[in-house]
Amino acid sequence: MPLGVRGTRREFRFPVWGLLLLALWMLPRALGVEEIPGPDSHEKQGFQIVTFKWHHVQDPYIIALWILVASLAKIVFHLSHKVTSVVPESALLIVLGLILGGIVWAADHIASFTLTPTVFFFYLLPPIVLDAGYFMPNRLFFGNLGTILLYAVIGTVWNAATTGLSLYGVYLSGIMGDLSIGLLDFLLFGSLIAAVDPVAVLAVFEEVHVNDVLFIIVFGESLLNDAVTVVLYNVFDSFVSLGADKVTGVDCVKGIVSFFVVSLGGTLIGIIFAFLLSLVTRFTKHVRIIEPGFVFIISYLSYLTSEMLSLSAILAITFCGICCQKYVKANISEQSATTVRYTMKMLASGAETIIFMFLGISAVDPAIWTWNTAFILLTLVFISVYRAIGVVLQTWLLNKYRMVQLEIIDQVVMSYGGLRGAVAYALVVLLDEKKVKEKNLFVSTTIIVVFFTVIFQGLTIKPLVQWLKVKKSEHREPKLNEKLHGRAFDHILSAIEDISGQIGHNYLRDKWSNFDRKVLSKLLMRRSAQKSRDRILNVFHELNLKDAISYVAEGERRGSLAFIRSPSTDNIVNVDFSTPRPSTVEASVSYLLRENVSTVCLDMQALEQRRKSIRDTEDTVTHHTLQQYLYKPRQEYKHLYSRHELTSNEDEKQDKEIFHRTMRKRLESFKSTKLGINQTKKTAKLYKRERGQKRRNSSIPNGKIPMESPTRDFTFKEKELEFSDPEETNEYEAEEMSGGIEFLANVTQDTATDSTTGIDNPVFSPEEDQSIFTKVPPWLSPEETVVPSQRARVQIPYSPSNFRRLTPIRLSTKSVDSFLLADSPEERPRSFLPESTHM
């Protein structure tokens, strides 16, 4: 066994990983000292097969190594769940950065790598903020927008002013010693240390899993207070440059005006680029492969444009992601949406890892440290105390107008969750040492504040939340009943506000929804995407999906899946579901799903994403059963490689074909079952009629029947159906589309010998015997009758003399699609069919 690798496997990993890191660091240093001959060297050298060019790839190679080290660090941290469940990942990364920074400084005695403001603001911060805005829950964010703005604007100004003035007051007392700091310097430091950092809040609060309202308030405050922070920082920085004697009242008014310009201007830039991105993705149907590129490039351009105009870049990219997510997700393909989602998460996670690790590395630099115990400790005390006071005062004011009150427990978590991070560090590093004499003291204090809030408060916030029993978020999909009631409550509250003449959240949301549906969606979304957003069809699709899962799971539990594997209809109808085994899946299926009116629509893509059952193993087996045995495509799809476009989604074609097949079968079965017509007799009748029609056509000249009265016959015809965007159609797409069912209206001629088409309906035939409808079904009592009104008797022709009240369909342990087998050619009659049938 090699030296230093003794012990268990867990003890084996970290030493080898550390030695590997040290070797990667020392190897370039050792090889980089080799003397490279200059152009003036007269030494003759022969041809070299391999040359070492470290200086040629030094910068990108080091960047790649640091990214690799950060990624490996996350893997090592998550090897032990006990560590990550107690210590936040951000705190672990800072500690790792301190260790790596110590190794680097011990090797060179120079802080070779630090977190610079340029790298942070232009390359690391945008992916994190874009990810937060693109996946922002819009309903929750805009519902609490007033509360978020109050905390972000008033709260940040309160924290900056009170912290700066309090430090200045203590400085005048002489406790801090001899420091060359003025009032404007203290206010400048208070403005940069007062802002809550979005990166730190995301890193800690996502692991705590507090309730959605509390999370969105703290996180929204950390995003939107950027405008206040930038304005205060720029105002006081310019005042320090001018000097306290030259600052006038006009300059103060300009500073207040600049706040509105910076915040509203950054928001407007983000909205404009969001609409531009949505409009571009509307026309990317034939260039699907570059759709994710548009999302990242245009969003990043909004950030750079705002930075170029001295506006709030964080607000710009945040609102760009918020405003474009709905239209972009509807326009781009499924593969592009998946690419955008995972790429954005990867970039945000990687940037967050690098930020915290380099915060630790940057701290290992003796040149930036200036220690003043009184200044550092008082800063920690003031930012904590004034944060709590500001939250309590603002919450007391907000609770007078909020429908859902913020309790004392929520206020404690909000006060304790005011974390500072890399934004404060980057701003303090930007200070000019010639203008701010005590810059190193400000930098040292900021590093201590960041480490204290991220490490200490991050370690203790989870036990605090558990001790206070704060309500946590429920990670589950809302049920259909909850969605329906939520929509009903929204309409009711909107109506109440409209009647009372008040303009509230519900009224504004309703007006915005109408404007979006009538104007924005038509402008920024493709027509096919607008059709797919129909809520009724979405609910119908989800019900069919649950129906399909229950259908296959029931047959699987009975131990017989032969009827699924066999494509023959004869084998399907011979399956007996009269006494199925009770299953637990039926408990999760609603009453509506057990009725005879549902339809099986097997959507494999949605099944993979939305299936939720009791046992994961059963779900897996059901999924593979549906995918392997329940559908056989009509043709083999060609898999072609192309660098410029993606292959068409086969599941989408299969889903649509399955839907049309199923609807055709269910519609025919529903007609035959309802009217008491046997499937075999109906098929035989249609076959005889078609054969007689062919004989008559052969005997008539030109194959045409004399026209008496043209009628339209709506029949089902097999045709190659193209499922594509109606506004964008090409010839080559029509050749690749799979077959389907199309409803066609054909003009036919009625003759004396053949005047009826399709299935005869005895209700509208006066010569038919109506005795079948007067019989009392076995499940009704003679007293359950309903007398129709005189108007009903006049409007309903050839109706039976007595009507029976429709009772609810009885619950059954059968699969919901087993009722389709009612019209099968069986010898014994079904219990729910009439005793006699009529042609």
Curated annotation (Swiss-Prot):
One of its GO terms (molecular function) is potassium:proton antiporter activity. A 1,2-diacyl-sn-glycero-3-phospho-(1D-myo-inositol) binds at G143, G146, T147, M403, Q502, I503, H505. It is a multi-pass membrane protein. Residues 596-673 are annotated as: Interaction with NHERF4. The modification Phosphoserine is found at S560, S568, S598, S613, S669, S724, S815, S818. One of its GO terms (cellular component) is apical plasma membrane. Phosphorylated by PKA, which inhibits activity. Phosphorylation at Ser-669 by SGK1 is associated with increased abundance at the cell membrane. Residues 597-701 are annotated as: Interaction with AHCYL1. Seems to switch between active and inactive modes in response to various stimuli. Activated directly or indirectly by membrane phosphatidylinositol (PIs). Regulated by a variety of auxiliary proteins, which facilitate the maturation, cell surface expression and function of the transporter. Inhibited specifically by the drug tenapanor. It is found in: Apical cell membrane; Cell membrane; Recycling endosome membrane; Early endosome membrane. It comes from the Eukaryota. It catalyses: Na(+)(in) + H(+)(out) = Na(+)(out) + H(+)(in). InterPro entries: Cation/H_exchanger_CPA1, Cation/H_exchanger_TM, Na/H_exchanger_3/5, NaH_exchanger. Homodimer. Found in the forms of complex and dynamic macromolecular complexes. Binds NHERF1 and NHERF2. Interacts with CHP1, CHP2 and SHANK2. Interacts with NHERF4 and interactions decrease in response to elevated calcium ion levels. Interacts with PDZK1 (via C-terminal PDZ domain). Interacts with AHCYL1; the interaction is required for SLC9A3 activity. Interacts with EZR; interaction targets SLC9A3 to the apical membrane. Interacts with SNX27 (via PDZ domains); directs SLC9A3 membrane insertion from early endosomes to the plasma membrane. The C-terminal intracellular domain is subject to extensive post-translational modifications and binding partner interactions which regulate transporter activity, scaffolding functions, downstream events and localization. This is Sodium/hydrogen exchanger 3. It comes from Didelphis virginiana.
